């Protein structure tokens, strides 16, 4: 496994769900707005301001085009965490005197769940929908959960840990029929899978720049204008962004997000073919070489840039240490500092012992076939060695049911 023979540079980046490298074309588009084109886009009295404003509006149109929205429906924010908070808390504050119920899903991103918990403390009722063992929600349970007090349903497009795609079109149809707003955290799906806010009846959608080869520190919230959706702002000030998000806009970052959206619009199909091919190559080769490897989440209804695998009989943390040539994660980058097993995997009904063995491998547009082959060889050789040392693996081979063992301490 000589990296020179594979013509690759170590470590290999395989954590594309946590963040993505900046596309060089995005960097090129941003640079002038850090140097000569430094105007404030809200300065209306001179050419420096007009130039910056034009750049911001072009970026707004590019972001809107990627999801079939109108440019006026795009509100720039600092990222998807802010967008999720603005959508959920903003709707609750504006409509909370008429309705008091929100529905979300147990496997949502931490910032959605935490925003909902915050609202619970303020008296809003929250329903957390369960997920099936494949990671996807049951539409019948959603229908049954909607009441005449429900103001919002919040369901993500693509899960950040397991990559499954929720049936947003069907969810949107249900919400529209019942007169309930639909918010979706589309950070992991924006620019990667086709999303059309009108076709899917999405009313609010959260976007992140750094998940699509754009800069960190910038994102957007799509807020439908027809019929008009109102949100109470989190930040008050000069009334920028239709009064929903005050503060001077960071022109270079917004230009970067716009350029990243434009590239994704033109190259999504090509990127998806590349990523799908590498996904199949990676998964098939690993499964041929080692046994007891499980793909977490639905195999077909998923974004193929995300492979969450469980390797029976080996701890996830020990795998990460063993394959240090690969930059990977044992869960969401926001929660992987905790040694608790993934709440997403647990909510799918995966047992603690398998949840502890999971690793998330991210494949992106810059990943090469050589890197995938090197990764497969490295993983398989290290898993074999770790299993030789693992008493759990030995017990499994002897047919002992690990669930029935009573451990002295944990």
UniProtKB/Swiss-Prot annotation:
Pathway recorded for this protein: Cofactor biosynthesis; iron-sulfur cluster biosynthesis
Binding site for [2Fe-2S] cluster: 334
Keyword entries, A-Z: 2Fe-2S, Cytoplasm, Iron, Iron-sulfur, Metal-binding, Pyridoxal phosphate, Transferase
Top EC class for this record: transferase
Active-site residues, as the UniProt record annotates them: 334
PROSITE patterns associated with the record: AA_TRANSFER_CLASS_5
N6-(pyridoxal phosphate)lysine, modified sites: 211
GO molecular function: 2 iron, 2 sulfur cluster binding; cysteine desulfurase activity; metal ion binding; pyridoxal phosphate binding
General function of this protein: Master enzyme that delivers sulfur to a number of partners involved in Fe-S cluster assembly, tRNA modification or cofactor biosynthesis. Catalyzes the removal of elemental sulfur atoms from cysteine to produce alanine. Functions as a sulfur delivery protein for Fe-S cluster synthesis onto IscU, an Fe-S scaffold assembly protein, as well as other S acceptor proteins.
Subunit structure: Homodimer. Forms a heterotetramer with IscU, interacts with other sulfur acceptors.
Protein name per Swiss-Prot or TrEMBL: Cysteine desulfurase IscS
